[in-house]
Curated annotation (Swiss-Prot):
Keyword Signal tagged: yes
Keyword terms, alphabetized: Cell outer membrane, Ion transport, Membrane, Porin, Signal, Transmembrane, Transmembrane beta strand, Transport
Species: Neisseria meningitidis serogroup C
UniProt record similarity statement: Belongs to the Gram-negative porin family.
Name of the molecule in the record: Major outer membrane protein P.IA
UniProt GO cellular component terms: cell outer membrane; pore complex
Length: 393
């Protein structure tokens, strides 16, 4: 009898050791369709010193491409251990998965860390989401495989989960803050932007971005405020050296991404990003507003400056099991090398509805429109739609 009791206790020890481990994640996939439209306006040519009067306008439109896609499924494990005197060890391991096949081949390619938490706050090291990623949860609630058009992809381009160390303070009267440090050797701030090439039949081929040598240490900071249904967030990024290309928008493969300028990169200096987000939640109503400023200097002798200014808004309201929502984003004409780019703005609208079959399973439907102006008379437009299913566990 005593041997049986001892065996029972010993067999229960491993279960007790993992009792604080939580398994969670989301499985989401569906059908997506999209097409791309473009217009190129060529000004009259000058012949023998005389300028012609004929403007050439070329329009192109791709066929609708439809495919079954994973919408960002992932699986995660997290847990904690009480170390006594109010101190806890915390850890998390997240991994992208795909119900459409393929996907990442390395574990921990999403937010994964280990750290300590206590009255002093929380300190974590590993792949930790930055403050921009935190703020985007309110402004960009969309699920899709197409993060350019069917999500606010341009606006949220600074969202990241860098290998870093991050400290989050406890809350004081509704306020909390955070700081984050990415060492140069872990920085992804140096790379050659992705771009398209054309063959003789004008078929586009994507050449993916190439990660290069680290640019420099990267610093993040954030300030949060919450009071009842109101919430606010300020996110900041700074890198002394960052090789992010001539135009941040080129990273999203639209507009002039086929130009020779887009294929090269200029080392940027003093790259900083500021984002301010505000939200209100009451009953079934959710509102979010955000503004973002992206500043940098070029590595040339003149130290010319670049800047982009953008705004975004999202609104949703719950009617029973249905949650319709709409998002809008606008990027103003950018400033590149100290000069304003005429007609270089962009506009984006996403509208859709989630229908909850239960607390964990929902149908998701959305339609999106994105137009990026690339000069006077020139633009690239993406139209997209998706319908899918999401299950949380």
């Amino acid at each position: 009898m005593r041997k049986k009791l001892t065996a029972l206790v010993l067999s229960a020890l491993p279960l007790a050791a993992v009792a604080d481990v939580s398994l969670y994640g989301e499985i989401k996939a569906g059908v997506e369709g999209r097409n791309i439209q473009a217009q190129l306006t060529e000004q009259p040519q000058v012949t023998n010193g005389v300028q012609g009067n004929q403007v050439k306008v070329t329009k192109a439109k791709s066929r609708i491409r439809t495919k079954i896609s994973d919408f960002g499924s992932f699986i995660g494990f997290k847990g904690s251990e009480d170390l006594g005197e109010g101190l806890k060890a915390v850890w998390q391991l997240e991994q992208d998965v795909s119900v459409a096949g393929g996907g990442a081949s390395q574990w921990g390619n999403r937010e994964s860390f280990i750290g300590l938490a206590g009255e002093f706050g929380t300190l974590r090291a590993g792949r930790v989401a930055n403050q921009f990623d935190d703020a985007s949860q309110a402004i960009n609630p969309w699920d899709s495989n197409n993060d350019v058009a069917s999500q606010l992809g341009i606006f949220k381009r600074h969202d990241d989960m860098p290998v870093s160390v991050r400290y989050d303070s406890p809350e004081f009267s509704g306020f909390s803050g955070s700081v984050q440090f990415v060492p140069a050797q872990n920085s992804k701030s140096a790379y050659k932007p992705a771009y398209y090439t054309k063959d003789t039949n004008n078929n586009l081929t994507l050449v993916p971005a190439v990660v290069g040598k680290p640019g420099s240490d990267v610093y993040y900071a954030g300030l949060n405020y919450k009071n009842g249904g109101f919430a606010g967030n300020y996110a900041f990024k700074y890198a002394r050296h960052a090789n992010v290309g001539r135009n941040a928008f080129e990273l999203f493969l639209i507009g002039s991404a086929t130009s020779d300028e887009a294929k090269g990169t200029d080392p940027l200096k003093n790259h900083q990003v500021h984002r301010l987000t505000g939200g209100y939640e009451e009953g079934g109503l959710n509102l979010a507003l955000a503004a973002q400023l992206d500043l940098s200097e070029n590595g040339d002798k003149a130290k010319t400056k670049n800047s982009t200014t953008e705004i975004a808004a999202t609104a949703s309201y719950r009617f029973g099991n249905a949650v319709p929502r709409i998002s809008y984003a606008h990027g103003f004409d950018l400033i590149e090398r100290g000069k304003k780019g005429e007609n270089t703005s962009y506009d984006q609208i996403i509208a859709g509805v989630d229908y909850d079959f239960s607390k964990r399973t929902s149908a998701i439907v959305s339609g999106a429109w994105l137009k990026r102006n690339t000069g006077i008379g020139n633009y690239t437009q993406i139209n997209a739609a998706s319908v899918g299913l999401r299950h949380k566990f």
